[in-house]
Amino acid sequence: MEELGVKRRIVLVPVPAQGHVTPIMQLGKALYSKGFSITVVLTQYNRVSSSKDFSDFHFLTIPGSLTESDLKNLGPFKFLFKLNQICEASFKQCIGQLLQEQGNDIACVVYDEYMYFSQAAVKEFQLPSVLFSTTSATAFVCRSVLSRVNAESFLLDMKDPKVSDKEFPGLHPLRYKDLPTSAFGPLESILKVYSETVNIRTASAVIINSTSCLESSSLAWLQKQLQVPVYPIGPLHIAASAPSSLLEEDRSCLEWLNKQKIGSVIYISLGSLALMETKDMLEMAWGLRNSNQPFLWVIRPGSIPGSEWTESLPEEFSRLVSERGYIVKWAPQIEVLRHPAVGGFWSHCGWNSTLESIGEGVPMICRPFTGDQKVNARYLERVWRIGVQLEGELDKGTVERAVERLIMDEEGAEMRKRVINLKEKLQASVKSRGSSFSSLDNFVNSLKMMNFM
């Protein structure tokens, strides 16, 4: 990296949410290993701690940014719009101060696509900027397509039950109802977000936490449409592991797993944002119990409306779960998926969880909640054929059957073979001369060109 001269610092700007923080910190680890200094610019909400895992990183907090109470009061979309409004000026000050203190050493600013306030600062200081997408390439394609649809016509289509089950033109095998809309706000708001992020996009390049062995056609579409270099350098959790959980992990579950039979356990975790009604949790508990399979269940505090944790659930729930299950508030997910006792993963299908499950060779039960999770679930079931998707209302019979299909049936055995094959391809992609390894090297070389042209 000596040839980079003094421009050896990369500034990272993450969205303050678990699913966005984790991959951008992994990206930071990967770039640090290439000889760059890393500065992470955070908001006051969900700040990453400067732990031993990131002791070589420099952390800055944008003054006056929003807090957790603002998120609760505004909701996710208004929060995001306001965050971009109020952070623009303070981020400019932050970058200006960095340039002054560090001797003009910034090679580029890498920002999460939803933190588009970064663009004003990089334009003012004439810095290279790189957009980082934490979702699949296919979900990125969907957002790009949706940013250009006729909003009025699309809203009518989405409200028509006859249309929602139809395949969306040009996005096979995705249906209208699989598109990345949100459970956290009206469709109009999500379309506005997509429009804002696309219209303001002036980045010199795009980094995606994916790999060509999973999404070659979507990556090719993006490379053609975006007209800037696209670098698929994932899966980052394999290429550059970097623990960055915003919740405390309960490691006692690993001891419980040690007592279970190989490939027998269903691991259930619905991510850091999904909410569940009591009736759905009871149907899950009954179905899991009736499947006669042991299960490890992550129930996140606050995920049950009106309850801090599980205390508001009926006694029947605790009895059902205690017979063959184990509940924790949060788990060390990659270690759990890697454990030989785990035979399946019931997931919300967030992109990080999807990559982690494939990366450990674990087939999935898919229950998407919002956004790009629906895209991922459809691909898991129909394209990669390593998942069983649960659609519609949950009932114990459907749950029991899904577990049986995954753990006991020949269908599940075939899924396991396919996911192990994908696991091997993912691992190969991040090794020397693999596609993602080479893509990261190409990105580093492009930074040299950005700073010496």
UniProtKB/Swiss-Prot annotation:
Which Pfam families does the entry link to? UDPGT
Q: Which SUPFAM superfamilies match?
A: UDP-Glycosyltransferase/glycogen phosphorylase
Q: Which InterPro entries does its entry note?
A: UDP_glucos_trans
E.C. designation(s) = 2.4.1.-
Q: According to the lineage, what is the superkingdom?
A: Eukaryota
Q: What class of enzyme is it?
A: transferase
- Record-listed UDP-alpha-D-glucose binding positions: 272, 331-333, 348-356, 370-373
Look up keyword Disulfide bond and say if it applies: no
Q: Mind listing the UniProt keywords for this protein, alphabetically?
A: Glycosyltransferase, Transferase
Database matches in CDD domains? GT1_Gtf-like
Determine if RNA-binding is one of this entry's keywords. no
GO MF terms here are: quercetin 3-O-glucosyltransferase activity; quercetin 7-O-glucosyltransferase activity
Function, as annotated, reads: Possesses low quercetin 3-O-glucosyltransferase and 7-O-glucosyltransferase activities in vitro.
Protein family: Belongs to the UDP-glycosyltransferase family.
Q: What is this protein called?
A: UDP-glycosyltransferase 76E1
Organism, scientific name? Arabidopsis thaliana (Mouse-ear cress)
